[in-house]
């Protein structure tokens, strides 16, 4: 964490204000029964199991607990990551992609690229390879929006950043609370 805070007083959401998937007891029972039947059918007939579709809530859940590099809070608590700013297109036969728009806490946030890189790394580690991941700064929320977007979606720059052990250590620290 930085000694000199750029945003000394960020707006913080309480954990109970964050979006979450609420499953009713019946839904859980139906879901587990369906999964069990699918597994049995798969074993008996060697039919390839259908893939589970991925929705924005699942992506949000993957990102919400990432720690901010400057504050002892999560990206969800700081509203850097919001459910409504996540787009998922999961095509069975075509291209599948995920776009996450991040909202920096201040327009001149120097941590924006680091946060975006962490989001990209987290998604690339967790998602099947069929997904193309785009991480972008939400329009009008950062002074260097186009430069940050270019860096976050340049495959060579991202790969080079992930080879830097010190930077990778920082990213892993930010993701340490993710389960």
Swiss-Prot record:
Name of the featured protein: MIP18 family protein C144.16
Positions of the UniProt region annotated as Disordered: 1-26
Highest taxon of source: Eukaryota
Gene source species: Schizosaccharomyces pombe (strain 972 / ATCC 24843)
GO CC annotations, alphabetized: cytosol; cytosolic [4Fe-4S] assembly targeting complex; nucleus
Disulphides: none
UniProt keyword annotation of tRNA-binding present: no
One GO-annotated biological process of the protein: chromosome segregation
InterPro entries named among the record's database cross-references: FSCA_dom_sf, MIP18, MIP18-like
Function: May play a role in chromosome segregation through establishment of sister chromatid cohesion.
Organism classification: Eukaryota, Fungi, Dikarya, Ascomycota, Taphrinomycotina
UniProt keyword terms in alphabetical order: Chromosome partition
Protein family (similarity comment): Belongs to the MIP18 family.
Any Pfam family hit: FeS_assembly_P
């Amino acid at each position: 964490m930085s000694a000199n805070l750029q945003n000394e007083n960020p707006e913080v959401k309480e954990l109970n204000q964050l979006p979450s998937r609420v499953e009713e007891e019946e839904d859980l029972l139906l879901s587990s029964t369906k999964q069990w039947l699918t597994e049995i059918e798969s074993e008996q007939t060697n039919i390839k199991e259908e893939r589970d579709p991925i929705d924005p809530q699942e992506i949000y859940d993957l990102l919400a607990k990432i720690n901010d590099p400057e504050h002892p809070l999560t990206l969800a608590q700081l509203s850097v990551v919001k459910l409504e700013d996540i787009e998922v297109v999961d095509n069975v036969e075509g291209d599948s992609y995920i776009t996450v728009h991040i909202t920096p806490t201040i327009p001149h946030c120097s941590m924006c690229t680091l946060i975006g890189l962490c989001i990209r790394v987290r998604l690339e580690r967790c998602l099947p390879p069929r997904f193309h991941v785009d991480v972008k700064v939400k329009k009008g929320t950062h002074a260097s929006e186009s430069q940050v977007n270019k860096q976050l979606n340049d495959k060579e720059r991202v790969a080079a950043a992930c080879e830097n052990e010190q930077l990778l250590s920082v990213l892993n620290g930010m993701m340490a609370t993710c389960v």
